[in-house]
Amino acid sequence: MRLACAAVISPANAPMHVASFPSSSPSSVAATGTDDARLLHHRAVDDAHLRLAHAALDEIEARLRAPPATASAAGAAASGGGPKDPYLGEVHRDEGHVVYAHVGATAARFVLVMATEEEEDDDDASGAAGGTREETLRGMFRALSEAYADAVSDPFHAPGGKIASEAFARRVRALADAA
């Protein structure tokens, strides 16, 4: 799986930072190969990733508002940590992407949209390799949470506003490069 999009959503469900990492393969770009076509393609991909992250917010809200017993039963398989685990696991899936979520101590939502490989089947996603994937995702969320904490601790950051820090953007980009 490849990181396609990373988003930080405020407790009020406003996007604080959204970074999309479209595939750079030549087959994913319009056949004309012009810069305009490439730009339009990447903008459409960015919008698709944003829609996926937005669609996942309903499930995130449902899990956060669920009573502890229900949240534990519903999310135990995905998160493995019970109702107080900030890692929510898989919250949305479509034919080419899986969306994972984590909720920070400040109620900020961290969303990772992972592009699935066509040859990958569901057994690999939840089987023996699932533990490794789970650890990798938790590590990515930990790194994203640390970058977020550093960014919002900046005295020039407006509370609840968009994260404009270049250092934060670089750290998010490093997550995509490492995935």
Predicted features along the sequence, with ranges:
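Short, acidic, Ser/Thr-enriched surface-loop or helix-capping motifs
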Residues: 9-10
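Acidic, low-complexity cytosolic segments
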Residues: 2-4, 18-179
